[in-house]
């Protein structure tokens, strides 16, 4: 049964001018969570860590770290939780969230494209080849769609 509190909540949801941006933000956060699960279950670090090591040989100034599985997964889970916590500010229409939103969307767009291109080419750098599809490939379309959605709403 709908209580008056439920009705008021629905009215607030429908009348918020930032609701579309909020849902776009949530969609990208959930797409990222799905992507993390995809990468974790398909062995992403078996491609990422050797790629970083190969890049360090030719470009030692690149600051990419090598990860253990636990540290990598914990860091990404914390990042997803923090991004979801920021959704409160998106809901409220905080102007300072716009640049963060653009950065988040562009990085996730590049991430999704990177996994798709990695799958097409079967490698990250010349010396690092892997069986197709690249780990994280299956969730990449969700990253692309959610990134585009957020960019359109920004």
Kindly give the residue locations of the regions a language model identified.
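Membrane-interfacial loop-to-transmembrane alpha-helix junctions, especially the N-terminal start
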Residues: 21-25, 96-104
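N-terminal signal-anchor transmembrane alpha helix
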Residues: 17-42
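Terminal transmembrane helical module of multi-pass membrane proteins
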Residues: 142-154
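Non-cytosolic membrane-interface motifs at loop->transmembrane helix junctions
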Residues: 100, 120-139
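Aromatic-anchored segments of alpha-helical transmembrane domains
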Residues: 32-34, 106-116
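Core segments of transmembrane alpha-helices
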Residues: 70-87, 138-144
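Perimembrane loop-to-helix junctions flanking transmembrane segments
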Residues: 48-63
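Juxtamembrane "helix-exit" motif on the non-cytosolic side of transmembrane helices
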Residues: 88-92, 114-124
């Amino acid at each position: 049964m709908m209580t008056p509190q439920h009705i008021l909540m629905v009215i607030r949801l429908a009348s918020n001018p930032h609701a579309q941006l909020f849902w776009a933000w949530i969609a990208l956060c959930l797409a990222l969570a799905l992507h993390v699960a995809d990468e974790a279950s398909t062995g992403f670090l078996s491609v990422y860590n050797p790629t970083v090591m190969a890049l360090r040989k030719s470009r030692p100034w690149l600051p990419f770290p090598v990860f253990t599985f636990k540290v990598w997964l914990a860091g990404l889970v914390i990042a997803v939780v923090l991004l979801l916590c920021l959704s409160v500010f998106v809901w409220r229409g905080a102007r300072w969230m716009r640049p963060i939103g653009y950065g988040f969307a562009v990085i996730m767009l590049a991430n999704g494209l990177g996994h798709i291109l990695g799958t097409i080419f079967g490698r990250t750098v010349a010396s690092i080849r892997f069986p197709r599809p690249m780990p994280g490939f299956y969730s990449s379309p969700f990253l692309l769609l959610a990134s585009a959605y957020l960019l359109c709403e920004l």
